[in-house]
């Protein structure tokens, strides 16, 4: 799933931007030497978050920063653990890791830009906020999406940002040093978005037509970026619409106080006494080489570092406001549009990522993602696994239960709670574009067996139109039919989607047909949402 892009041909390209410098990128060519897109990879948008800047908000580059240089190779990625959650998955040797990871990658369609400039998609990668990279891999390479004949041409920008403990470590020690020291990865994304707004016109983009989107944790991040703007009218209102692929917000993130246990565990893992002062603990943690930190993440009991409720980027009423329609009212008043949806087998990847190793471990693994009281409520809601004589069969059932809980919380329930809240808030249905993907191109068989249907993130080849990866000629009309509406939405925020009720979505069925169908998971998704809301006294 994470192979390097296929480049059939290329040539240098140069962009001379007054006040910024001369940027040397790469023009991607097709097999006949025709230009498909221009690629500029590894553009720095913030100072390196290293040394004393580890676990600090990103720092903007100084005025007059000279961007002159070569941008024809991908730069370094945030250090991260290796999740072996897909069959025969191996690390890509082309990926290079370093704490210095705050770079943007930009792809620009070849050919003459529209009079108003290209629409822009600021796309945040997935990976649980623990792993991933800003589209260094084949499945998200937009060269065919941007080539002649594509019905959805726009500029694509993807930010590298801090992940796992580098991006989401939280604790009182950090707040004592600086009350704004939390959710560093979200602030990275925001600064990259601000950079895009400021500079994208130099690449041919329309800064007044920027969508934010993402897959999985990138969708989660995109939602938080949208929430941040709607709750901070003093900030630049950059985002015109949001593309939320397979993720939403199902629960209020843990408080900093709840995350203190995780901070303490990390300190103890490296022999740092908890009785030291906050400054001393941070000094010792900052002295640890980044690779040592990354290599020990999966050795922690609490190994997943997620967003925290800090009262700043993540306000304490986020889930409540989504649930009761308050956020929906803000979206209604702003006039923004959203695409929200899923694939037909979200379950499989979640069942195989950090799966429980025993019945007792089930609570711990769910608690890695959600607050303790929510974990208890979820385990009471779902049918319990009965005792079995065959231990292997029993563990498989525990793993399946884990996958069901997490796929509901991350996708199936969270998106339905969001949609319901938008409707409660008065967002008109013509601004909510629901979808479900059941179609998979034949090329995907080399990544996942056909029986896995369309697994989580298995639709990336659709959204990025990976012709070069093996889309068959007879499948191209299916892809183009879907992308036509997507391209219209990216350009104008409007398209003929076909849905007329909240409980309907647009389905790209397994046979390649597009139809509008009733949502069979609607009631269950809202029931899961009510269970979580009940924990917080919201029902």
UniProtKB/Swiss-Prot annotation:
Compartment(s) where it occurs, according to its Swiss-Prot or TrEMBL record: Cytoplasm; Nucleus
Broad EC category: hydrolase
EC number: 3.1.-.-
One of the record's GO molecular function terms: carboxylic ester hydrolase activity
Keyword Cytoplasm: yes
Record's keyword terms, sorted: Cytoplasm, Hydrolase, Nucleus
InterPro entries: AB_hydrolase_fold, CarbesteraseB, Carboxylesterase_B_AS, Carboxylesterase_B_CS
Record-linked Gene3D superfamilies: alpha/beta hydrolase (3.40.50.1820)
One GO CC annotation: cytosol
Pfam families cross-referenced by the UniProt entry: COesterase
Annotated catalytic residues: 216 (acyl-ester intermediate)
Family per record: Belongs to the type-B carboxylesterase/lipase family.
Protein name stated in the entry: Uncharacterized esterase/lipase C417.12
């Amino acid at each position: 799933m994470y192979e390097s892009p296929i480049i059939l041909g290329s040539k240098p390209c140069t962009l001379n931007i007054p006040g910024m410098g001369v940027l040397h990128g790469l023009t991607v060519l097709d097999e006949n030497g025709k230009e498909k897109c221009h690629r500029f990879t590894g553009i720095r948008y913030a100072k390196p978050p290293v040394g004393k800047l580890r676990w600090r908000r990103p720092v903007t580059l100084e005025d007059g920063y000279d961007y002159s240089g070569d941008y024809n190779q991908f730069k370094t990625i945030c250090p991260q653990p290796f999740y072996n959650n897909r069959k025969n998955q191996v690390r890509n040797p082309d990926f290079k890791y370093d704490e210095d990871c705050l770079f943007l990658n930009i792809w620009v369609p070849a050919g003459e830009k529209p009079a108003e400039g290209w629409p822009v998609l600021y796309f945040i990668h997935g990976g649980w906020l623990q792993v991933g990279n800003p589209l260094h891999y084949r499945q998200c390479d937009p060269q065919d999406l941007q080539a002649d004949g594509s019905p959805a041409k726009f500029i694509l920008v993807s930010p590298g940002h801090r992940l796992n403990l580098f991006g989401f470590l939280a604790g009182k020690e950090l707040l004592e040093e600086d009350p704004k020291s939390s959710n560093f990865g979200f602030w990275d994304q925001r600064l990259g978005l601000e950079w895009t707004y400021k500079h994208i016109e130099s690449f041919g983009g329309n800064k007044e037509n920027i969508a934010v989107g993402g897959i999985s944790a990138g969708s989660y991040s995109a939602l938080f970026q949208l929430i941040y703007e709607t709750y901070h009218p003093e900030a630049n209102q950059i985002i015109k619409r949001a593309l939320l692929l397979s993720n939403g917000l199902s629960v209020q993130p843990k408080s900093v106080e709840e995350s203190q246990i995780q901070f303490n565990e990390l300190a103890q893992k490296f022999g740092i006494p908890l009785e030291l002062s906050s400054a001393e603990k941070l000094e010792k943690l900052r002295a640890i080489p980044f690779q040592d930190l990354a290599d020990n993440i999966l050795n922690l009991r609490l190994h997943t570092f997620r967003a925290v409720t800090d009262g700043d980027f993540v306000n304490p009423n986020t889930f409540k406001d989504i649930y009761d329609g308050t956020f929906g009212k803000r979206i209604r008043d702003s006039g923004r549009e959203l695409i929200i949806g899923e694939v037909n087998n979200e379950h499989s990847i979640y069942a195989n990522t950090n799966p429980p190793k025993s019945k007792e471990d089930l609570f711990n693994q769910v608690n890695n993602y959600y607050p303790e009281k929510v974990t208890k409520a979820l385990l009471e809601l779902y049918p319990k696994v009965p005792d079995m004589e065959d231990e292997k069969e029993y563990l498989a059932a525990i793993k399946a239960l884990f996958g069901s809980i997490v796929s509901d919380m991350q996708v199936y329930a969270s998106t339905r709670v969001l949609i319901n809240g938008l409707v409660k808030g008065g967002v008109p249905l013509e601004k909510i574009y629901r979808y479900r993907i059941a179609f998979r191109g034949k090329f995907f068989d080399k990544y996942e067996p056909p029986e896995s249907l369309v697994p989580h993130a298995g639709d990336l080849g659709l959204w990025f139109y990976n012709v070069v990866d093996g889309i068959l000629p007879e499948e191209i009309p299916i892809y183009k039919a879907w992308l036509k509406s997507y391209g219209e939405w990216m350009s104008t925020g409007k398209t003929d989607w076909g849905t007329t009720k909240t409980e309907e979505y647009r389905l790209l069925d397994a046979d390649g047909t597009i139809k509008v169908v009733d949502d069979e998971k609607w009631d269950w998704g809202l029931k899961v949402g009510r269970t979580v809301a009940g924990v917080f006294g919201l029902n």
